[in-house]
A protein has these predicted regions:
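DNA major-groove recognition helix of helix-turn-helix/homeodomain DNA-binding modules
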Residues: 39-54
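A short, Lys/Arg-rich alpha-helix, primarily the initiator
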Residues: 1-10
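Base-recognition residues in the alpha-helical recognition helix of bacterial helix-turn-helix
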Residues: 28-31, 39, 57
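Surface-exposed alpha-helical interface segments used for non-catalytic interactions
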Residues: 2, 20, 42-43
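The alpha-helix within a helix-turn-helix
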Residues: 8, 19, 45
């Protein structure tokens, strides 16, 4: 959840814009109020311009 927030903020995007573009309630995802599937995570990574591999590699650091 924290990593997704970092990706969004690094792109200078508001939660509202991400919701409009993706139809995902990123606010609930970022605070851990909802679980997401790997498919949703993949779509969000694509939206933020990163890959699932990069996403998980950065978590390991």
């Amino acid at each position: 959840a924290r990593k997704l927030k970092q990706l969004r903020e690094a792109k200078g995007l508001s939660q509202r814009i991400v919701y409009i573009d993706t139809d995902f309630n990123i606010g609930k995802i970022e605070v851990g109020k909802t679980n997401i599937t790997i498919s949703t995570l993949s779509r969000l990574c694509n939206y933020y311009g990163t890959s699932l591999k990069e996403f998980f590699d950065e978590l390991d650091q």
